[in-house]
């Protein structure tokens, strides 16, 4: 029987990736203040997401998870949020049509402020200072003052998350998600992309379907489902003091839910079974995820599942696999076989970003688009050969025209990286690269769909 859990039981465990605050009294005061603030999301929304993820686990839907490597205070602008939302919608429409099933949209947004680091300090020009750990903890400026962890930043992160969520809800329900608009945006991408001829056929089929639905009376003006959408939020549960303060009892069920986001995940560096991050995540009722890197073997994975999803509840646990294009073929199959052998219910999703990071000649971290796509293709191949469901993709992306990942049809090169390299942490796919990934994945989903029986569809004609 699992030990008794409470929102603060993690405090008795060893913890990794925690900042050292110089004034613990001020930290406690901020955490107490956060505990009085309204929730950012609601338990019913988290349950709704879990039900949709259960469909993904059953092979009946696909998960699209994407967003910033790390949100920042400086880049908190309405146009940046709008552009992210637009690109994620464009990706989802293409994947929905090609796969013939629901796409669950999950943003790395409205809470993705903290980042684990490989070293506690960094050196620039011979000077050593604490590492930048995300705007919720300290500043990116390389000064002694900026790098001191400041608990007031948690209050700033809460307020920014609330404002971001408010705008996202308005976009999702206020008509910006109109399917006709999204299709026009995709046509613009196809027209302007050097590889547009490859995607023209799919775009044409979507246009035909929209014309057919309009002829049947299914228009955005008359059908709310064609002008609104659902978008859920997610982030890594790294700052456990913040997460504890935002964890509340649901009045309808009596269960504990994290209200900082709909979906939280544990990172590859903090998933030790006897440590604080797993202890916290095991007790909340939200759907949760776990990053699975090269160091995770089948036996440890099964123990991780037993800790985070002891009831084997469909939709509860998503495994976010991040191996690298050169390792996925060796490391992923044993994990899939162990899950199938033990009858575990999980969502399998592919993070093709973190295992494919390299350093360019100019010193910039980057991710080659061809390596990203090689890992995605291998992920689909492996799941197909193992008889399991390739449930989704998890990408670091932006709606902006940055130059951080090399490659893609518009051929960002290493010499281009300095043009618009804006990330505070890891390189992200830009808008065009994100859409190109979606179109390539859609081709794979179409092949997968053509290999299974078509469901019966009934459409009532309009007036």
PLM regions: where:
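N-terminal leader/presequence segments that precede the conserved core
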Residues: 1, 53, 402-403, 463
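Active-site-facing alpha/beta catalytic cores
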Residues: 70-71, 76-324, 367, 375, ...
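N-terminal basic/disordered segments at the start of proteins
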Residues: 1-62
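Non-transmembrane, aqueous-exposed alpha-helical and coiled segments at domain scale
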Residues: 301-304, 310, 316-348, 354-403, ...
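Short, compositionally biased low-complexity segments
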Residues: 18-22, 54-66, 123-141
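A general structural signal for short secondary-structure junctions and capping/turn motifs
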Residues: 53-56, 94-96, 280-281, 382-386
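Glycine-rich, charged/polar anion/phosphate-binding loops
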Residues: 48-50, 274-277, 304, 333-335
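Short loop/turn segments at strand-loop or loop-helix junctions that form parts
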Residues: 64-69, 106-109, 350-353, 396-398
């Amino acid at each position: 029987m699992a030990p008794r859990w409470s929102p603060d039981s993690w405090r008795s465990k060893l913890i990794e990736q925690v900042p050292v605050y110089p004034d613990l009294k001020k930290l406690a005061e901020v955490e107490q203040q956060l505990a009085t603030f309204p929730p950012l999301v609601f338990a019913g929304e988290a349950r709704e997401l879990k039900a949709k993820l259960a469909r993904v686990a059953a092979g009946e839907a696909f998960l699209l998870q994407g967003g910033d490597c790390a949100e920042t205070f400086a880049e908190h602008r309405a146009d940046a949020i709008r552009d992210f939302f637009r690109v994620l919608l464009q990706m989802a429409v293409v994947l929905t049509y090609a796969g013939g099933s629901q796409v669950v949209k999950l943003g790395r947004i409205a809470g993705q402020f903290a980042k684990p680091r490989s070293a506690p300090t960094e050196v620039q020009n011979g000077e050593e200072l604490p590492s930048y750990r995300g705007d919720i903890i300290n500043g990116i400026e390389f000064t002694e003052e900026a790098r001191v962890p400041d608990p007031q930043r948690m209050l700033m992160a809460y307020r920014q998350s609330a404002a971001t969520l408010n705008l996202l809800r308005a976009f999702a329900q206020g008509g910006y998600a109109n399917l006709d608009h999204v299709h026009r945006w995709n046509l613009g991408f196809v027209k302007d992309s050097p590889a547009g001829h490859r995607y023209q056929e799919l775009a044409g089929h979507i246009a035909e379907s929209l014309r057919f639905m309009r002829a049947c009376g299914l228009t955005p003006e008359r059908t709310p489902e064609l002008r609104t959408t659902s978008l859920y939020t997610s982030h890594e549960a790294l700052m456990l003091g913040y997460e504890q303060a935002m964890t509340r009892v649901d009045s309808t069920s009596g269960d504990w839910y994290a209200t900082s986001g709909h979906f939280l995940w544990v990172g590859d560096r903090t998933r030790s079974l006897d440590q604080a991050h797993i202890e916290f995540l095991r007790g909340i009722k939200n759907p949760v995820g776990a990053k699975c890197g090269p160091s995770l073997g089948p036996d440890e994975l099964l123990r991780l599942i037993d800790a985070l999803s002891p009831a084997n509840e469909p939709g509860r646990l998503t495994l976010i696999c991040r191996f690298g294009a050169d390792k996925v073929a060796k490391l992923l199959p044993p994990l899939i076989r162990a899950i199938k052998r033990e009858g575990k219910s999980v969502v399998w999703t592919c993070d093709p970003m973190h295992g494919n990071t390299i350093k360019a000649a100019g010193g910039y971290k980057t991710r080659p688009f061809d390596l990203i796509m090689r890992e995605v293709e291998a992920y689909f191949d492996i799941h197909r050969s193992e008889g399991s469901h390739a449930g989704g993709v998890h990408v670091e992306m932006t709606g902006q025209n940055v130059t951080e990942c090399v490659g893609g049809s518009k051929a960002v090169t290493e010499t281009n990286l300095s043009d618009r390299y804006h990330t505070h942490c890891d390189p992200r796919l830009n808008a065009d690269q994100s859409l190109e990934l979606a179109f390539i994945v859609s081709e794979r989903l179409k092949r997968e769909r053509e290999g299974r029986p078509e469901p019966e569809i009934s459409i009532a004609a309009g007036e």
